[in-house]
Amino acid sequence: MGGLYSEYLNPEKVQEHYNYTKETLDMQETPSRKVASAFIIILCCAIVVENLLVLIAVARNSKFHSAMYLFLGNLAASDLLAGVAFVANTLLSGPVTLSLTPLQWFAREGSAFITLSASVFSLLAIAIERQVAIAKVKLYGSDKSCRMLMLIGASWLISLILGGLPILGWNCLDHLEACSTVLPLYAKHYVLCVVTIFSVILLAIVALYVRIYFVVRSSHADVAGPQTLALLKTVTIVLGVFIICWLPAFSILLLDSTCPVRACPVLYKAHYFFAFATLNSLLNPVIYTWRSRDLRREVLRPLLCWRQGKGATGRRGGNPGHRLLPLRSSSSLERGLHMPTSPTFLEGNTVV
């Protein structure tokens, strides 16, 4: 084992593995590759900004401190980190790849696996929360914050463990024949294990939502109200978009785990599938704000404040009687509106 870890700082190991698994090492920085890299980085910056606005909105407004929105905030955090990880992955790809040590390569790829794991477990936590809210039409107990934080913390801990297994030793540095083609320093068995875990979790989430749907449709009006159905529709859309975006990448990884080295040319195009999967982190904030009026107002508040600030600067020296009115909080916009206080209505009353 000591010999294995001693290879982590050997800069020749990465090139050795790429030479073994790839037919050709096309690592030249061409103009088209530069344009593609620039586009991906811009896309990832948009992902970071979008999800940061969602996190700020959830943090600053107490209306969004319910279990449902905290779990959505956790999903936004994983999407934000996914954007950061993909920027790092893009900057450290191409010609830079062959100059990396195995340790740096594991850090580059492991960060992406960690954020993916966090997204999957966030979706599972949301499904469990919906099941609890539907099954128990009452507010959580006084220990709800502790239990939510423990669930979120556990999801990140498991994600760190899953993403960190290769750097802890589950890799193919000493066994070239066991290496993945898409991820040449990862063992095929590790890739197969992770994709299987994710697939089983996603199937379990789908089964949970099917069960919740039938429970809601067959329940009384206090459970199957329009807000409850709208919130269920929102989280179902989030799940569906995740599956659509990641299914091609999961399929490529499953093929990679079973295909002999250099026998499946489609594996050399895997980066297109992962780029498509990244769209999931871009679309999630759009879904949240599209489906929730209050969250949409809160997310747009910093942009409106910035716009009003520019307008105030442009009017300096003008009519002193003309002043900008401060933005009202989203909660004040709904003042006077009384809604039922069961958890399904309490957490779903902002969904359109």
UniProtKB/Swiss-Prot annotation:
Lineage, top ranks: Eukaryota, Metazoa, Chordata, Craniata, Vertebrata
Q: What is this protein called?
A: Sphingosine 1-phosphate receptor 2
Extracellular-facing ranges: 1-34, 96-109, 174-189, 256-271
Q: What single Pfam family name could you report for this chain, choosing any that match?
A: 7tm_1
Q: Which family does it belong to?
A: Belongs to the G-protein coupled receptor 1 family.
Glyco sites are at: 19
Gene Ontology cellular-component annotations = cytoplasm; glutamatergic synapse; plasma membrane; postsynapse; presynapse
Protein function: Receptor for the lysosphingolipid sphingosine 1-phosphate (S1P). S1P is a bioactive lysophospholipid that elicits diverse physiological effects on most types of cells and tissues. Receptor for the chemokine-like protein FAM19A5. Mediates the inhibitory effect of FAM19A5 on vascular smooth muscle cell proliferation and migration. In lymphoid follicles, couples the binding of S1P to the activation of GNA13 and downstream inhibition of AKT activation leading to suppression of germinal center (GC) B cell growth and migration outside the GC niche.
Q: Name one GO molecular function term.
A: G protein-coupled peptide receptor activity
Q: Which residues lie on this side of the membrane: Cytoplasmic?
A: 60-66, 129-147, 211-233, 293-352
**Localization:** Cell membrane
Question: Can you supply a Gene Ontology BP term from the record?
Answer: regulation of metabolic process
Cite the record's tissue specificity text. Expressed in all developing tissues with highest levels detected in primitive, transformed cells. Relative abundance: lung > kidney = skin = gut > spleen > brain > liver.
Identify the keywords attached in UniProt to this record, alphabetized.
Cell membrane, G-protein coupled receptor, Glycoprotein, Lipoprotein, Membrane, Palmitate, Receptor, Transducer, Transmembrane, Transmembrane helix
> Its encoding gene is what?
S1pr2
Membrane topology category: Multi-pass membrane protein
Annotated organism of origin: Rattus norvegicus
Main location per the UniProt record: membrane
Which residue ranges traverse the bilayer? 35-59, 67-95, 110-128, 148-173, 190-210, 234-255, 272-292
